[in-house]
Amino acid sequence: MKRLILATAVAGMFMTGAAFAADSYEIDPTHAWVGFKTNHAGWTKAHGAFKAVSGTISFDKADVTKSTVEIALEAASVDTNDEKRNTHLKSPDFLNAEEFPQITFKSTSIEKTGDKTAKVTGDLTLLGTSKPVVLDVTWNAESALPWDANTIKTGFSATGSFSGADFGIAKMADFGIGPDIALDIDVEAIKK
């Protein structure tokens, strides 16, 4: 009986350790940059960014495939360096920020591609439509803040792309932009 209790306790410790192998992080909104660019009538690439970014990361360093990420962007925070254009992008012609205030990405699978790289597949939800998007992600570094040893920060960079038409942004072609939108993401996240 004592052996059974001891075996159960040991098994419980291992199962608990496995369950808590991933560390939890919260994206630091003051150190998060989500940029995008798209063709502008063949002249150049038009650039923009979302200024309000939040999210969480569950990062399992021992088995990155068990990690998860969720990111939310406030559609009304779009910034393209021109207020008139920003207002138009927030309208029903493009992001329809009033009806769909958030753009989200939730990971569904992760494939390790190198020591610090992975392909993260997730559901991008934009204008009420969810479609899979693949991001190429690099884990940059993790360390304590130089002025606060109790605060651990980790950082990631990611790139990817999607077609605006797939999400119902039908007016892109009317304004000579797109069809693809390239993403450039850098986030720092604080360990909870």
Q: Where in the sequence are the language-model features?
A:
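Repetitive helical segments and hydrophobic/amphipathic motifs
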Residues: 11-12
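Low-complexity, acidic/polar, glycine-enriched regions of mature
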Residues: 20-192
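Bacterial N-terminal signal peptides that target proteins for export
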Residues: 1-6
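N-terminal signal peptide c-region/cleavage motif recognized by signal peptidases
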Residues: 16-18
